[in-house]
UniProtKB/Swiss-Prot annotation:
A zinc finger (RING-type) spans 15-59. The lineage of its organism: Eukaryota, Metazoa, Chordata, Craniata, Vertebrata. Keywords: Antiviral defense, Coiled coil, Cytoplasm, Metal-binding, Mitochondrion, Transferase, Zinc, Zinc-finger. Zn(2+) binds at residues 96, 99, 118, 124. A zinc finger (B box-type) spans 91-132. It is an enzyme of class 2 (transferase). The keyword Flavoprotein does not apply. This is E3 ubiquitin-protein ligase TRIM34A. SMART domains: BBOX (SM00336), RING (SM00184), SPRY (SM00449).
Amino acid sequence: MASTGLTNIQEKTTCPVCQELLTKALSLGCGHRVCQACLITKKNAVINPREKSSCPVCGTRFSLENLQANKHLANVVERLGEVKLKPDIGTKRDLCVHHGEKLLLFCKEDKKAICWVCERSQEHRGHHTFLWEEAVRECQENLQKALTRLRKEQEKVETLEADIKEDRLSWKCQVQTERQRIQTGFNQLRRILDKEEQRELKRLREEEQMILDSLAGAEAELAQQSQLVEELISDLELRREWSDTELLQDMSGILKWSQIWTLKKPKAVSKKLSMVFQAPDLSGMLQKFRELTAVRAYWDNFTFNPENLNLNLILSEDHRQVTSVSIWPFKCCNNGILGSKCFSSGKHYWEVDVSEKKAWTLGVYTRKRTLRFDVRQRKGQPNGYHRYKPQNGYWVIGLQHGSKYSIFEDSSNCDPTVLNPFVATPLHRVGVFLDCEEGTVSFLNVTNHGSLIYKFSQCCFSQPAYPYFNPWDCPAPMTLCPLNS
């Protein structure tokens, strides 16, 4: 392609008269280009510029005064002349400097081009030689392979760079999440400690007020006795001034009263506090907090199920709160309501606010057999608690009469075995943790930092398990706590 282009340029820059590169090229009206000297020296050239002459190539007549020098073509001719000054450079490069033969072979050991004479020389005897074209082709193939491999490596580098960027973002997100988790955890611990501090200070204030009230009462009583004694003393001193007759006539009464009067000592008040503050077990609190945080990871957000709602139960607009109302003249003993979700596998957790209620029951229920209960409690009919047994599909705890906490276990008779656990902190918020695979139902005192209330083990969930709630006839609301509340 390059040689063809060069040939075309040479044709356009060659004078058709002298067959040499154009010198002071002139462009004729017919389009041909000739040297100025060739045009003037032609036998048909005319000295008088007003006369007409003809093109030496095609014979077209033209006036000499209209001729113009082609400067662009002159520049091209000048550059082409520089190239033609060394016409044998490319040829010499293809010839052996020692023998003048064409370099048609390639020596693998010396890695250079050689001619056929070099191949037979002592210098290259025993060397591996190939045709120049084959060596070039092999070299190009090797270059292509290397290029392909490097491009693949480059792609790997780009992929690794992208992975590193992604890892950096991922780590930043993980670190940020962990930072927030740590800050949240310690903020919660600080709130717990603040709450414990306020509770201890409140207890101390109450004890202080009780002791001060007792001391104030004792002080008032002593003041009364002191006043009475002063009056008696004053009366006796006054009587000493009386006459003998007056003294003897009225002496028996005042003496008798003075003799029988004795000081009534006030009730002794302890000089020591009933309870000395002890720093809370931070490790135990932290462990309970960690356990609570762990189960809260399985929080299920659901509502009360409005289907088949008993007439004496009223749901809030968002179905997260249930309230019991009385239906005269009947007293309901089956106020149960289920959650809007059921569970057959996995781990699930929810929390219930019962802070205002004096009676409630909550936990997990699964259908084991058909149980029929009359919503009207007639005379002689057992109360609604007798059905709360695991063998009937109930794993529940509850509160009765505002202070009696109950856990309902299986028994050999109709009524369940009722356990009454000691609860140091009243249950205002209860957490329920269901583990279907382990077959356990755990109840946590969220009010007391997540301490365990009770855990049912070896639970059999042959049917889907439902969250269960019973507000009883207590009018205070029972509320499902929203996530992260």
